[in-house]
């Protein structure tokens, strides 16, 4: 009887497993295929060089290089979010195809250890590997690899100097692409060995068109004014704008995305709060000013964010003379430096707002 029960249990378990496996098989055949969630920044990253927006000169040169399969060492520099990394990744995919892309490309960014030891070992070992000149699909493939050093301006001078010799020795089998925001932080011997390309800041129109296209594909309810506001607070960084758009969409849960939602997502200080600071400064009351600053800190707003937004508000203020603007701007620079050095936020903001109050009351 016990054996019989065991047998029944086993057979029942087998039947249960079989039954459970049936819908999984049906799902794997394509009827109910589950799509993996992907960040929109990666989902809408350019897949080929021609999809790169607003960088016509760079695209034209790369297109000629891809046609001849003759790629020089590259140096991409420009503001963040303008497509530097996306451009070289798209070019590498076109050169090597999806099957060889992982084998032929080594990508290192600021999150990786990139001291002199890494340049001497990891980069050098990868560069010394020999590769064939053909792909599995029969298409021609250049006989070299690509090393992408993202945020190269954060590398030490010693690591950059070590990289110089590696670039020379492995020129037959490896091409290097250095990506940075500030080209002045790259040593001259490296820049002289690379073809330099400056990535221009994306215009507001280009960014708005791209965001509207993504919003349409993702069925996001958002108006043109909200898109324009999103572009403004992103400060020319399209990557940041796309991330804010996705976060705002998830927060609203399918409802229309408003400016207030975008403000909360982006960590921007509301315009009403900035106006409240100016109102307190105009009043000439130090007690009112202290209450406003204390409330600002209690709400969790970043002091550096306030400095940036106050700077824009001061520059656009038509009631202030150029002399008063210059005094306040100089104070903004001092406060920004002190905050970067770890000074107390409350004291620095009080000092800044006191200067603004002094200039506003003198101007009246």
From Swiss-Prot:
NCBIfam families: PRK00440.1. InterPro entries: AAA+_ATPase, ATPase_AAA_core, DNA_pol3_clamp-load_cplx_C, DNA_Rep/Repair_Clamp_Loader, P-loop_NTPase, Rep_factorC_C, RFC_lid. Transmembrane segments: none annotated. The keyword Disulfide bond does not apply. Subunit of the RFC complex, an heteropentameric complex consisting of a large subunit RFC1 and four small subunits RFC2, RFC3, RFC4 and RFC5; the RFC complex interacts with PCNA. Forms an heterotetrameric complex with RFC2, RFC3 and RFC5; this complex has ATPase activity but is not stimulated by PCNA. The heterotetramer of subunits RFC2, RFC3, RFC4 and RFC5 interacts with RAD17. Interacts with ATAD5. Interacts with CTF18. Interacts with CNTD1; this interaction facilitates crossover formation. GO terms for biological process: DNA-templated DNA replication; positive regulation of DNA-directed DNA polymerase activity. Despite of the presence of a putative ATP-binding motif, this protein does not bind ATP. This is Replication factor C subunit 4. It comes from the Eukaryota.
């Amino acid at each position: 009887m016990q054996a019989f029960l065991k047998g029944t249990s086993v057979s029942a378990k087998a039947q249960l497993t079989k039954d459970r496996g049936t819908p999984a098989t049906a799902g794997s055949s394509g009827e109910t295929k589950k799509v993996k969630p992907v960040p929109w920044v990666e989902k809408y990253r350019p897949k080929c060089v021609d999809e790169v927006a607003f960088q016509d000169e760079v695209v034209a040169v790369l297109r000629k290089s891809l046609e001849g399969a003759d790629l020089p060492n590259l140096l991409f520099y420009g503001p963040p979010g303008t497509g530097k990394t996306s451009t070289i990744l798209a070019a590498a995919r076109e050169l090597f195809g999806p099957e060889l892309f992982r084998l032929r490309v080594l990508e290192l960014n600021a999150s990786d250890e990139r001291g002199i030891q890494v340049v001497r070992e990891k980069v050098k070992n990868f560069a010394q590997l020999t590769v064939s000149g053909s792909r599995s699909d029969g298409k021609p493939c250049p006989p070299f690899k690509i090393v992408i050093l993202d945020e190269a301006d954060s590398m030490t001078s010693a690591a950059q100097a070590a990289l110089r010799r590696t670039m020379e020795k492995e020129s037959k089998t490896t091409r290097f692409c250095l990506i940075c925001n500030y080209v002045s932080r790259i040593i001259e011997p490296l820049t002289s060995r690379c073809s330099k390309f400056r990535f221009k800041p994306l215009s507001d129109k280009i960014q708005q068109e791209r965001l509207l296209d993504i919003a349409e594909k993702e069925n996001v309810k958002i108006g043109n004014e909200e898109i324009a506001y999103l572009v403004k607070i992103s400060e020319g960084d399209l990557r940041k704008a796309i991330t804010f758009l996705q976060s705002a969409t998830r927060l609203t849960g399918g409802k229309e995305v408003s400016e207030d939602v975008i403000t909360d997502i982006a960590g921007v200080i509301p315009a009403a709060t900035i106006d409240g600071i100016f109102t307190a400064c105009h009043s000439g009351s130090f007690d009112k000013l202290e209450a406003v600053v204390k409330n600002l800190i209690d709400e969790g707003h970043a002091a550096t964010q306030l400095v940036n937004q106050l700077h824009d508000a001061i520059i656009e203020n038509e009631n202030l003379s150029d002399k008063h603007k210059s005094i306040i701007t100089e104070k903004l620079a001092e406060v920004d430096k002190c905050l970067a050095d770890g000074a107390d936020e409350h004291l620095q903001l009080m000092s800044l707002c006191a200067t603004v109050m002094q200039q506003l009351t003198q101007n009246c």
